[in-house]
């Protein structure tokens, strides 16, 4: 998260946040694992009306993996960050306070509570839509007619999806209408 005057930050272990295998990358935060979390108190700035995204990296190696965090173009209702890592990934993180379409970065459109896009060497590796209807980047689209939690991700050169409801996935010129499912091949 970008810095802010009057901000207090607390690190906590929250309860597990997902019960469905395949819904989160690497099945993180499934029982019995806790969810690493931060509690942020901000005087005079309500997160309900001013969104934020944070990056927290705990590491045991001699050096961190996060090389840099860059704030992306946003507006009062949408915030975005680009996170560059030592292992060659670029992660784009988006958060909004409304359910309108936003364009927080070039060639990206987003309508949801949380959006994540991961690229490696400019090639898409993952898209995650948290409680939303659409996430688009270039020729890749993840969308639904209702709010869903959904992801498309590449594992060992094969594309998979997970979703809590029906989704439409566009990859280049190919479009697939998919039902709810977890760790399903595309």
Language model regions located:
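Non-catalytic terminal regions with compositionally biased, polar/charged low complexity
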Residues: 39-53, 57-186
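Trp/Gly-enriched beta-strand surface patches
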Residues: 1-35, 101
């Amino acid at each position: 998260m970008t810095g802010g005057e009057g901000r207090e930050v607390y690190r906590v272990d929250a309860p597990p946040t997902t019960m469905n295998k395949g819904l989160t990358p690497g099945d993180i935060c499934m029982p019995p694992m806790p969810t690493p979390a931060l509690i942020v108190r901000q005087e005079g700035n309500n997160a309900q009306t001013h969104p934020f995204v944070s990056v927290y990296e705990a590491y045991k190696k001699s050096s961190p993996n996060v090389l840099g965090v860059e704030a992306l173009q946003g507006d009062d209702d949408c915030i975005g960050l680009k996170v560059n890592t030592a292992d060659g990934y670029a992660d784009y993180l988006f958060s909004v306070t409304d359910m309108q379409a936003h364009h927080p970065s070039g060639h990206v459109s987003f309508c949801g509570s949380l959006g994540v896009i991961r690229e490696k060497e400019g090639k898409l590796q993952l898209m995650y839509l948290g409680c939303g209807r659409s996430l688009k980047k270039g020729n890749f689209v993840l969308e639904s007619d209702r709010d869903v939690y959904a992801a498309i991700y590449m594992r060992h050169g094969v594309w998979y999806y997970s979703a809590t409801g029906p989704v439409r996935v566009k990859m280049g010129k190919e479009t697939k209408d998919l039902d709810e499912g977890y760790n399903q091949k595309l």
